[in-house]
């Protein structure tokens, strides 16, 4: 009973709630990077909740109202950066409650020869809608 009151008062789970929530909420982040590296926009779109918000390095805000607006132009990323793949370097849960989790995400980008050319810190907000976790918003210093 006391633990339940602590959760209600603080919004932070105690005991076994945090690890299970963390792994469930992290799953769409892992799936996003798998889809991104596979250059699979359909799979990538399924990891997101809509409207989806992305804030880029220049402070520009993209809002995708639904999956038809979402996606990544992989050809442009390859042309502009020489991108071949990305790695998910660390994912740290910073805040959470039953419907929203904030993650600090660090990822790197690599060229085809395996050279890492960029590492970015970012904030990802993952939400639970109708029992399904999805990435609702991302803010990073990546272009």
What does each of the following model-derived ranges do?
Residues 41-91:
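A solvent-exposed, acidic/Ser-Thr-rich amphipathic alpha-helical stretch
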Residues 109-117:
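Short, cysteine-centered beta-strand-loop-beta hairpins and adjacent loop/turn segments enriched
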């Amino acid at each position: 009973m006391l633990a339940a009151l602590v959760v209600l008062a603080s919004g932070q789970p105690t005991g076994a709630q945090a690890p299970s929530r963390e792994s469930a909420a992290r799953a769409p982040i892992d799936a996003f990077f798998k889809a991104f590296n596979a250059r699979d926009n359909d799979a990538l779109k399924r990891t997101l909740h809509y409207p989806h918000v992305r804030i880029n390095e220049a402070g520009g805000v993209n809002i995708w109202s639904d999956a038809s607006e979402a996606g990544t132009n992989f050809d442009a990323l390859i042309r502009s950066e020489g991108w071949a793949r990305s790695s998910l370097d660390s994912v740290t849960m910073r805040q959470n409650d039953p419907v929203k989790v904030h993650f600090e995400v660090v990822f790197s980008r690599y060229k085809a020869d395996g050279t890492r050319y960029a590492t970015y810190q970012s904030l990802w907000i993952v939400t639970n809608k109708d029992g399904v976790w999805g990435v609702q918003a991302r803010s990073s210093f990546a272009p």
